[in-house]
């Protein structure tokens, strides 16, 4: 698989002052409305991970589900859902974390992973790294290990990728935006 050059940033809409004043939200819905754009993103991740040694894909609630499920299907890997608090029906492990908007909790089914598993964790965007750090902690609490954290977008000025790397979690993103970039 080889993907031609593509202007991914053109399919990521900046929404000013959402969800609160001073924030530029990176809306990926135009990307999902573009079959060519979505195929490009999927192909980039598949090319990177097709021969990688990991056992599971973990996807973050909710936009991480969109790309994580495609990659899990294409790579024939089990998909583990990391959900916002109160959304999973069985026994869960829970981890609190800070987001750029406040405090939140992430949960995963307690029986989703076990010792020896290796998980590629996906989200749409890395900002402060809080969600993916919480997921990494949950993975480690099951006895599994984190293979890498991947996202479509990185906001490097918010230090999320650096925080993940400092916690022993390698990161990979397809593109990045500065906080003031439109």
UniProtKB/Swiss-Prot annotation:
SUPFAM superfamilies: PRTase-like
Enzyme Commission number, as recorded: 2.4.2.7
Reactions this protein catalyses: AMP + diphosphate = 5-phospho-alpha-D-ribose 1-diphosphate + adenine
Top enzyme category: transferase
Molecular functions per Gene Ontology: adenine phosphoribosyltransferase activity
Top-level taxonomic group: Bacteria
Alphabetized UniProt keyword annotations: Cytoplasm, Glycosyltransferase, Purine salvage, Transferase
Gene Ontology annotations for the cellular component aspect, listed alphabetically: cytosol
Major localization listed first in the record, in broad terms: cytoplasm
Gene Ontology biological process terms, A to Z: adenine salvage; AMP salvage; purine ribonucleoside salvage
Involved pathway(s): Purine metabolism; AMP biosynthesis via salvage pathway; AMP from adenine: step 1/1
PROSITE patterns listed in its UniProt record: PUR_PYR_PR_TRANSFER (PS00103)
Subcellular location: Cytoplasm
Pfam families reported for this sequence: Pribosyltran
UniProt-listed InterPro entries: Ade_phspho_trans, Adenine_PRTase, PRibTrfase_dom, PRTase-like
Record's subunit section: Homodimer.
UniProt similarity note: Belongs to the purine/pyrimidine phosphoribosyltransferase family.
Function field: Catalyzes a salvage reaction resulting in the formation of AMP, that is energically less costly than de novo synthesis.
Name of this chain's protein: Adenine phosphoribosyltransferase
